[in-house]
Amino acid sequence: MNILSMTYEKFVQKIQELGLEKYRADQILDWIYKKHVFVFEQMTNLSKQHRSLLRENFCIQIPKIVSKRVSSIDKTTKYLYELSDGNTIESVLLFHEGYATACISTQIGCPVKCSFCATGQSGFVRNLDAGEIVSQILAIEKDSKQTVRNIVYMGMGEPLLNYDNVIKSIKILIDKKTKNIGIRRVTLSTVGIPEMILKLSEERLDLNLAISLHASTNEKRDQIIPINRKYSIQEIINAAKNYQERSDRRLTIEYILIKEFNDFDEDARKLAKLLNGLKVFVNLIPVNSTFSNFEKPAKWKINRFKEILINSGIEAEIRYEKGADIEAACGQLRIRNLLSKQL
């Protein structure tokens, strides 16, 4: 059993079933989550007998670093990890105002296949289990010697299509006995699966929800996000409203700006109208053209789009890519690795 896949309560139960006291579970989790010790033999406040018992019944699966790139611009660090079955995933460590943020993956590949995203181009393999999601945080902290303060579920994959494992991983990471990450420092990014957003509302987790909208009309969104043909923009907005009413959290809207596609004044006005009445913040993101045929709009046009939103009462900011020199955007490192193996 992988300890990283277990909630605190479940781990305590298993420890007690082995005849150990509850406080032993606390000691073990302290070694793992605070000291980043992943080998039972190195847990020196446990007896040899206890360490042997743990080794026979549990494992601590930490992914292997296949590749690591550090930006010379902003110290953003991109990791490519190999899992126990040989599949690879990506995680990114970012720095903002002195705080470390981990951007983590939830699936190997992605079934959504957004046309501007590198991850979808490599195909979908499988969901990550809760332990594989949690392990990314520990692997980042172990290597970087940084304490992750914020977590964004914004790496490879669509989190709401791996709902149970994602929610379980969040509950593990926010537990005071493990990472003790504040729930308001957790952000989940989704293209918008209405029924799953409604289900998330029932969790009462009050995490930050980011909707990857990227268009203000179904006609345009259908062209870049195929799943929109199943879930319309209005259905997504209605579900987001429900989430906001339950959580009282400001929503983040992610909007990729693509030259001469969704960057017109009319697009901005329609977006403002669509978001009217919601407490939202819009991240305007010039498209990354590395693995697509799309181009970034001119800076003046990006600024103009932002200005229209702000003048319409919508908070907005331009989010320029971090780690541009190391291809830190989702899926790029993995797809390069896959391509190299085919040569």
Curated annotation (Swiss-Prot):
Residues that coordinate or bind [4Fe-4S] cluster: C110, C114, C117
Major site of localization recorded for this protein: cytoplasm
Domain of life: Bacteria
Domain Radical SAM core, first and last residues per copy: 96-325
Protein keywords: 4Fe-4S, Cytoplasm, Disulfide bond, Iron, Iron-sulfur, Metal-binding, Methyltransferase, rRNA processing, S-adenosyl-L-methionine, Transferase, tRNA processing
Disulphide bridges: C103-C330
Any matching Pfam family: Radical_SAM
EC numbers on record: 2.1.1.192
Enzyme class: transferase
GO CC terms in record: cytoplasm
InterPro entries: Aldolase_TIM (IPR013785), Elp3/MiaA/NifB-like_rSAM (IPR006638), Methyltransferase_A (IPR040072), RlmN_N (IPR048641), RNA_MTrfase_RlmN (IPR027492), rRNA_lsu_MTrfase_RlmN/Cfr (IPR004383), rSAM (IPR007197)
Binding site for S-adenosyl-L-methionine: G157, E158, S189, S212, L213, H214, N288
Compartment annotation: Cytoplasm
Listed NCBIfam families: rRNA_mod_RlmN (TIGR00048)
Name this polypeptide is given: Probable dual-specificity RNA methyltransferase RlmN
Species of the source: Pseudothermotoga lettingae (strain ATCC BAA-301 / DSM 14385 / NBRC 107922 / TMO)
Gene: rlmN
